[in-house]
């Protein structure tokens, strides 16, 4: 019902590969290092936990095929600033079919994600600017008898447990 209520355009297929050290140094900081591939475009992402509900997210398009081939000074600065080691290796990978509807301050995302051993569905609201996103997201969900509660593991956690 939610999918047909908004003018979602062509779904996007994206593959996410997450990286960490053998000692899970990134995970210990409640962070994530990811390369997202959409068609031939690769986007590097560093997420660092700000508080219980929010992460800082740094993104930059890259041309490197492998995490260890990235030689971008800005990305190196993020790694140094947040003490992210450079000896990273892939820890999980999955593909998501994402439908996106843009609002003024964020995007409503309906995801169907294919993991190694299962498929799941998720509704997300991703901020594009600072605002009371939780309240706004719940106002959308209310119309369908739903309410957002932090009740499920993240996609990376689900992939690691797959």
Language-model segment annotations:
Residues 1-162:
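Phosphate-end processing signature that detects enzymes handling 5′-triphosphorylated RNA
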